Amino acid sequence: MEKLQGHRELDRSWQHNFFYPLIFQEYIYVFAYDHALNKLILLENAIDKKYSLLIVKRLITRMYQQNHFILSVNDSNQNEIFGHKHKKNLYSQMITEGFAVIVEIPFSLLLISSLEGKEIVESQNLRSIHSIFPFLEDKFLHLNYVLDILIPYPAHLEILVQTLRYWLKDASSLHLLRYFLYEYRNWNSLIRPKESISPFSKRNRRFFLFLYNLLVYEYESIFVILRKQSSYLRSTSFGALLERIHFYGKIKYLVKVKVKVFGVILWLFKEPFLHYVRYQGKCLLASKGTSFLMYKWKYYFIAFWQCHFSVWSQPRRIYINQLSNYSLDFMGFISNVGLNSSVIRSQMLENSFLVDNIIKKFDTIVPIIPLVGSLAKAKFCNGLRHPISKSGWTDLSDADIIDRFGRICRNLSHYYSGSSRKKSLYRIKYILRLSCARTLSRKHKSTVRAFLKRLGSEFLEEFFTEEDKVLSLILPRDSSSSGFYRGRVWYLDIICIHNLANDE
């Protein structure tokens, strides 16, 4: 364990080192096991944690055996790996998962340090995805235009390997990665035929998501450096973007190239009201500038991706929208900047007059149609929004059934608690509440009315309104409302929203 701690306490300049030799060490499964334990802090129902210990340890055992890295040169049609054609996908999957565990170790160390309150050198604190919404409420009210950008992905796997060259000094690890990427391309086991890199297969999603996120990280690192060339800008608007230390030596060169090749003058980066938010495979770039400036940003991004990363992005993937006439559809919310009119009576001496004030307000609305579609797909209701029983859960105990329904309801309540209009959320809660009652009544071979009459209507009502009761105790209640607290409260401990279909 002392040797393990020694590896974890390595110098923080982890960009210049790699853990490739650990693949051939017996105790690499300890890293994988520790990684799975730390992941429990973030994801309550982490699915990937179940393979981290077992598969990586099996991988090491098989790599110690002989004649596994033997390719068949006599039979080109078989293209065997590890000596057995029917096992090649299994072994390759284990290696990619072990590779993903190892390369994620530096990021895990940064995340653990942030959770423990330790200072992270040369990086900003990691924040919840829900910190985006208070940020938008404060900043987007003063902006005019927004770029809705679909981040491009590389069409060739070699681009991913070239990206990793800036991170890894170990050539053998790059050769290993390149070897498996090209084998995967031949087997069509990682990427589906004739499809892009974004729809990853479920078995190898973790490995390719890491490579894709690393490429996006490269985009943003250079973008941050160019943006910091202007002393008028603040870095806090970029959220959780980690800085690349070894890029600082290339700042002057990059700026000169940008100006010379693209004809982009530096005042493009000196927009004092410029805010950037990334979510999933998209990003938003909002500015107080004119539409002409946003067009310059649009074609700058296209040239930037094409010339420096050999990634082609079509102009129709970047949309320019005016915030006053545009609704942002992202992260499960429909958000817009609306104009609210408020009339104030003012009196000066003996004269009184009315003042009509126009105030901008950032509204977040719960999308009822997609949520009902998710409930129908998960068999909680039919296409007509009528709640139905969850037949697959009737074999569970009553406590487990209530716990599953309650977990879904709490996740939705926490995630959409900051929305300005909660009427749609109450409809979703009603569907879940009645679906839970139908499931329990079906299990006990009774009707919903008889079941609720026997246990009391407060049986489910008290359970599903527990969060509202807690809020009503700690927060002031609206005097005009006799119900529970209905204000906007963002739960900033939210990391992700669970898919309803995964709760089965």
Curated annotation (Swiss-Prot):
Disulphide bonds in the chain: none
Keywords on record: Chloroplast, mRNA processing, Plastid, RNA-binding, tRNA processing
Biological process, per Gene Ontology: mRNA processing; RNA splicing; tRNA processing
Record keyword RNA-binding present: yes
Molecular function per GO: RNA binding
Stored InterPro entries: Domain_X (IPR024937), Maturase_MatK (IPR002866), Maturase_MatK_N (IPR024942)
Entry keyword annotation includes tRNA processing: yes
One CC-aspect GO term: chloroplast
Location of this chain's protein in the cell: Plastid, Chloroplast
PANTHER family membership: MATURASE K
Entry's family note: Belongs to the intron maturase 2 family. MatK subfamily.
Chain's role: Usually encoded in the trnK tRNA gene intron. Probably assists in splicing its own and other chloroplast group II introns.
Protein name: Maturase K
Protein source organism: Amaranthus caudatus (Love-lies-bleeding)
Gene designation: matK
